[in-house]
Amino acid sequence: AGPQLDVSCFAHDKNIGSRTEQLSVVHVASAQDCMKECQALPTCSHFTYNKNSKKCHLKAGAPEFYTYTGDMTGPRSCEHNCSDACWMDGNNPLAVWDYSGQPPALCWAACMGTPGCDLYTFQGMTCKLYSQTSSKRA
């Protein structure tokens, strides 16, 4: 077994699921294994893992959160935890999401799962998605 993946950037005990369309469902032993499955699929932006059923739901698209007992929703990777005005605001974002209480890495997952999204900002609780033509790098 290789090094353990970092799964510290999202809540494991808040019962947060994602309604986003799923690519597939697999049975795995842990959130780390679920993240590994997501990373193996090029179009997987995030996943929902249920610690009770051990089901790993692999998702493509921006996370759409809801409450479900035992669920935890995490990004493809915890490496993308940029926050605090990583990108300057453009005039017309592709999408604006209220991600109250969610980690910046799930805003990155929303960008990855949104066609045309190249950049994102995560300020306060707001995740904004941009194409390269709608914003400039800070």
From Swiss-Prot:
PTM comment: Contains six disulfide bonds.
Classification via Gene3D superfamilies: 3.30.30.180, Hepatocyte Growth Factor (3.50.4.10)
Annotated GO CC locations: cytoplasmic vesicle; extracellular region; microneme
UniProt subcellular location: Cytoplasmic vesicle, Secretory vesicle, Microneme
Superkingdom as given in the UniProt entry: Eukaryota
Oxidoreductase listed as a keyword: no
UniProt KW keywords: Cell adhesion, Cytoplasmic vesicle, Disulfide bond, Lectin, Repeat
GO molecular function, one term: carbohydrate binding
Residues binding a carbohydrate: S18, K59, Y66, D71
Keyword Transmembrane helix in record: no
Family: Belongs to the microneme antigen family.
Subunit structure: Homodimer or heterodimer.
Protein purpose: Galactose-binding lectin. Plays a role in adhesion to the host cell. Has a potential role in invasion of host cells.
Name the UniProt record assigns to this protein: Microneme antigen L2
